[in-house]
């Protein structure tokens, strides 16, 4: 994709950034705000593309952005792309959904709390607390 077209991507587009050559690192990071998240970088190993992808990935991760480099044997790379696409489709299908949370974790469970805001940011999911009293009302009918 030509960098002028990067703004035409929507969150519903599954995107892979093909790093065809070295020397494009600065160009990619100039478009940091427009990059798909997570950033999937495809390097073919020619023209210093792998080195450039590693440099870009390191820069992105240093700024808290997830990235993955696809590189290696073609059949495995293709399989990985299919997995990433399936994950993308599944994640997009969750966007806008509401999940009812019944009850709360016991106080002795120190790692079982759900960060509602983080889930909304990552997946577009809204959690709604449902009291157990409300559940009992429906089951007593």
What are these regions (language model features)?
Residues 1-141:
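An N-terminal assembly and electron-transfer interface module characteristic of large anaerobic redox
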């Amino acid at each position: 994709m030509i960098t002028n077209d990067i703004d035409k991507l929507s969150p519903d587009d599954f995107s892979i950034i093909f790093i065809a050559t070295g020397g494009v690192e600065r160009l990619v990071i100039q478009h940091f705000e427009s990059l798909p998240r997570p950033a999937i970088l495809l390097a073919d190993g020619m023209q210093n593309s792998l080195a450039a992808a590693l440099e870009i990935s390191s820069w992105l991760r240093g700024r808290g952005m997830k990235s993955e480099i696809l590189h290696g044997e073609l059949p495995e790379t293709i399989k990985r792309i299919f997995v990433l696409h399936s994950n993308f489709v599944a994640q997009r299908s969750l966007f806008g959904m509401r999940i009812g949370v019944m009850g709360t974790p016991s106080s002795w469970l120190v790692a079982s709390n759900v960060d509602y805001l983080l889930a909304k940011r990552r997946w577009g999911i809204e959690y709604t607390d449902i009291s157990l009293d409300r559940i009992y009302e429906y089951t007593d009918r």
